[in-house]
């Protein structure tokens, strides 16, 4: 993989089969390795993200290295800490064929540039509190732990994000 050939662009409807495969692979990996696992994923929410240009893919030549979504608000997870001054990264999944190739680092770098262009003060994300390995992984990329909380059961949250004990992480810009 040549990092200079890597691009981040919006996903399209044509990408849906691969997106669903990536989610299935991520869930399988989580379960096999004893990590907290998504209980499924909301295809309607993913379709809305695609339609609203909020889901992205990282590509290198013909290969899709991973997918992720963004938002500019996340009150269901961040509560009163959501002040409208952040870019939120969600559902970041690396294609298992490209693990170990610093795909997340490229996503983080893109997010920093994108958030700065939008004059936002933070990049934020969350992950399961009972996955200290993943928390440490994100800390290794410059994120700091802000808080821990339980997400709501609100219908505006994707199914896989409801009633979770999460650790909130942010990177000041």
Predicted regions and their residues:
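Conserved active-site alpha-helix within GNAT-family acetyltransferase domains
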Residues: 105, 117, 129-147, 155-157
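C-terminal "cap" of GNAT-fold acetyltransferases
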Residues: 121, 128-131, 151-173
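Glycine-rich phosphate-binding loop
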Residues: 102
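A short beta-loop-alpha structural element at the N-terminal edge
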Residues: 6-21
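Conserved acyl-CoA
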Residues: 106-122
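Acetyl-CoA-dependent GNAT
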Residues: 13, 25-33, 37-97, 105-110, ...
């Amino acid at each position: 993989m040549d990092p200079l050939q890597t691009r981040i662009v919006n996903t399209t409807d044509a990408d849906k089969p691969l997106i669903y495969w990536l989610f299935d692979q991520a869930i399988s990996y989580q379960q096999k390795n004893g990590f907290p696992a998504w209980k499924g994923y909301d295809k309607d929410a993913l379709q809305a993200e695609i339609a609203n240009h909020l889901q992205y893919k990282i590509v290198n030549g013909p290969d899709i290295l991973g997918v992720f979504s963004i938002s500019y608000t996340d009150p269901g997870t961040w509560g009163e800490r959501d002040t409208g001054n952040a870019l939120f990264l969600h559902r970041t999944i690396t294609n298992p064929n490209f693990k170990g190739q610093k795909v997340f680092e490229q996503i983080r770098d893109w997010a920093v540039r994108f958030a700065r262009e939008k004059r936002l003060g933070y990049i934020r994300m969350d992950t399961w509190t009972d996955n200290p390995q993943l928390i440490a992984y994100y800390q290794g990329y410059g994120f700091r732990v802000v808080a821990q909380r339980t997400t709501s059961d609100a219908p505006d949250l994707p199914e896989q994000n409801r009633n979770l004990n999460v650790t909130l992480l942010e990177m000041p810009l």
